[in-house]
Amino acid sequence: MNTTANPSNIIVGLSGGVDSSVTAALLKQQGYQVRGVFMQNWEDDDNDEYCSIKQDSFDAIAVADIIGIDIDIVNFAAQYKDKVFAYFLQEYSAGRTPNPDVLCNAEIKFKCFLDYAVGQGADTIATGHYARKEVRNGVHYLLKGLDRNKDQSYFLYRLKPFQLERAIFPLGGLEKPEVRRLAAEFNLPTAAKKDSTGICFIGERPFREFLQKYLPTDNGKMVTPEGKTVGEHVGLMFYTLGQRKGLGIGGAGEPWFVAAKDLTKNELIVVQGHDHPLLYTRSLVMNDLSFTLPERPKAGRYTCKTRYRMADAPCELRYLDEETAELVFDEPQWAVTPGQSAVLYDGDICLGGGIIQTTDKPVIITR
């Protein structure tokens, strides 16, 4: 297990899922003083048919009961709306595609929850993330999880050194099938529960239906780069770069993909073929930089992920100023999307990254 220096009092973030359930059970088995916290980060739609928050809380309470630990339900909904959801709406309004899970980790799970846990006398917090942590010469390093299919270091890149020092990830050295097996051995009610998908506050409801409640929509044309109209979109915010499904463009030839958004004309620019040149980029500019180590990495050679679960892409890091950097890739990268995160790695070490603003292709047009 990846720990700080002999933590004894640990508070586990119990989400009602199998991963956090096994995390708590393992720590209790290993002799630590363990308590659970269920974080209620969304509350507007508690009676919505798609909302699973209540069931998740019931599952978390049931798990705590079986393990034999206390659990508190703590409401961070106000902080979530202020720090995460407002940003989510702002980015979609600007034509970008944000990743609220990244911000939720930095602002809620490893800030609000961490502050709460420390206030309760905890030495450390634990979560069910598939990531690892190693301490070398007093420095806490965030590493990829051993299960490459589940590695979640991408979503943790905004953690600061002080947050990493107080966090442990007991599942980092395990693979998902083993976690399921352990859940069954511990007789946990979440052993067969399916993994959650999508953004936590949206749940299983259709994304378009949810977003329309908060942002105005405006239909417009789908056009080719040459300006030919080939269809109609239902609102630019509902589409992301590289999207293929849901375009509704008929006719012969290769599938159509979203290549860019023209916010001035309210047009969605689409191209035919996965390998169309407009879908590939050789460089990007990112800002709002955040790093996991006390000193930011030097300019130079690293690998990068511009979306979750993609293969590491070799690149060159160049700083433009204190808050902005450029990444130049060895090979063109597909559908690099403003609003998403570019995360840097040195081998297995997650160094940090930033928010993608622009690429060498005009993908968000505001002229």
UniProtKB/Swiss-Prot annotation:
It catalyses: S-sulfanyl-L-cysteinyl-[protein] + uridine(34) in tRNA + AH2 + ATP = 2-thiouridine(34) in tRNA + L-cysteinyl-[protein] + A + AMP + diphosphate + H(+). Disulfide bonds join 104-200. Pfam families: tRNA_Me_trans, tRNA_Me_trans_C, tRNA_Me_trans_M. One of its GO terms (biological process) is tRNA wobble position uridine thiolation. Its EC number is 2.8.1.13. ATP binds at residues 13-20, 39, 128. One of its GO terms (molecular function) is tRNA-uridine 2-sulfurtransferase activity. GO terms for cellular component: cytoplasm. InterPro entries: MnmA-like (IPR004506), MnmA-like_C (IPR046885), MnmA-like_central (IPR046884), MnmA-like_central_sf (IPR023382), Rossmann-like_a/b/a_fold (IPR014729). The active site is at residues 104, 200. Catalyzes the 2-thiolation of uridine at the wobble position (U34) of tRNA, leading to the formation of s(2)U34. PANTHER family: MITOCHONDRIAL TRNA-SPECIFIC 2-THIOURIDYLASE 1, TRNA 5-METHYLAMINOMETHYL-2-THIOURIDYLATE -METHYLTRANSFERASE. This is tRNA-specific 2-thiouridylase MnmA. It comes from Neisseria meningitidis serogroup C / serotype 2a (strain ATCC 700532 / DSM 15464 / FAM18). The gene is mnmA.
